[in-house]
């Protein structure tokens, strides 16, 4: 019998050594495994595991009232029965006193690649049976795009990602890939729902081997794989829209755009062209104008225009570009530029959003209709855009704009979180910490003593993926994996299913929640339902017993390579887009009707609220990139992430010119700061990043010293601003951040405490 565990970053074999210790090994069928995942085995047994239920001392003394001490208080160990009793009392009290809309059930994160133990599914099922909850919509990864794309191409974000032109198709006919934001391979190591085999690097290499040229437009050279030998165009962060507008200007001025495609497949071009030519505000979007904004030489802009005019071109937009001030604009403008080139719907090019952002985008696999745990229906209609949680806690009842709607923030009295770490992914963490004190009660299911656990009132210790059985069924991955339990539950921890079952029993709906099914019953249920559903694809799965014995099953790869919007290209009348016009909307009357000042009827240059073109107090632009040695904040306690630290802090990439001007050397502990906070990090001097830009990867566990107001470990979200991309999308804007940096003095340097368990500090 083969033993595997599949995670969001890859699939591994597990075994026991002579001392009964779990060891992980790379799966031999994966040509590009993720190194940091091997550290899961050690992390599953480390000193930061939560050993039993805990309650915060101050909350217990004030029973059901916030005392403002979350994140600063001691914890008291309690029994499971006591923990279930306390939590169920608070849930009932909140429901009966304020209604279910006063409960915010959060599960944002990548807690499990398994379909059954998927934390959000468990949370939704439990709270829907309890009467509902206020929820969040969108993803921090691509919130602006989720709102924008239906208006522009008539497809939701997930359908768009699944429809991407495959690497194989591009390798056959494309000649140039213009990478706005690059294609960093480290990002492609992960995929929501799990990874069988890593394929992105193989796809990019095939394009390169077939002669496709790549241009990396980014402040970071490493945003492009080394083997591509890509042309490097360093650009000021947040100015990609201006560059694209200037390329459109050249195409229009030279009469080099594809008029037939614009006429037959788009609407609203004339209004957009008038803006580009300066007929609306007397400002031409010329190369000279764009150069002053982007810092790219005028000559280089003309050279880029010549490339895209003469070559079959793919316009690739990274997810990171829309996590910035007015983040809707670079994506909208990228689609518009691709439309002007006229190769949308062909293997020659078009546009892409998120190539190399995750493993599955661009692979040669069709989406599978896999089934999951039934979740029921949420009777509460209140929701927030996912990145507006601090606003919600600060301003209950306040009206806000979202996608043309006027909505109000719910008044939250209780937060229940399982699967995720808002003290990683949210912006302006000092502001979040204050807002986090407002609810009466905060309950979490958590594996380790991370910042999320330390800012809670009631803590249920949860299992890792190694401590449970599950099924990796990713709709966008051809490999299905039997996730087998590798070790017994650590100490007194439980699965999320067991935790919610215990609460459901206290609250009187255990039978409805479990349907009298065990863990393995549910796993087989999901397999059986998926086996039925896949018949629509003319495919057959083996029996569950055969699959479980072998440990994995691989589905066939389709013979026809997908090309995005190919049906629309072949016959726009027969296969219209789901936009009001049935076409690509370069100008949108729907968005125009919203009358928003920060998102107009067509792509537009908006000056960011912080950027290198308007320096006042802070002279460096901070990029908080995805980390190489962990997934977001997951496994920051793992060996690979720990070994990447500099003097125990997260490394910050600094250009040699900026370091020299500040008398900083490699390995120094430095202080990054702005009006929102202060962060310690370890200096890594490199000309891989352009002058004026520093890079501090996201995901270092938040480790604040509340007395000195300094974050000790290197979490960039202490410095980022918490404001929406626009009134349309309300996405996060973490990449619009100016900071200053200096060598830290002795009084500012403190030991990192986040990896010391509260259980061992007594």
Question: Which residue stretches match the model-derived regions?
Answer:
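Long, contiguous, secondary-structure-rich segments that constitute the structural scaffold
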Residues: 496-550, 633, 638-653, 657-762
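Extended redox/cofactor-interaction regions of prokaryotic respiratory oxidoreductases
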Residues: 119-206, 210-217, 242-245, 339-454, ...
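Short beta-alpha connecting loops at secondary-structure transitions
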Residues: 228-234, 466, 478-490, 639
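N-terminal export/assembly segments and adjacent metallocofactor-ligating motifs
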Residues: 1-256, 297, 505, 704-762
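Phosphate/diphosphate-binding loops
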Residues: 1-8, 440-441, 447-448, 482-508, ...
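Active-site phosphate/pyrophosphate-binding segments
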Residues: 138, 247, 267-394
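N-terminal leader/propeptide and maturation segments of large enzyme subunits in energy/redox metabolism
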Residues: 59-82, 249, 254-298, 302, ...
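Flexible glycine/proline-rich, aromatic-decorated loop/lid segments
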Residues: 223, 450-483
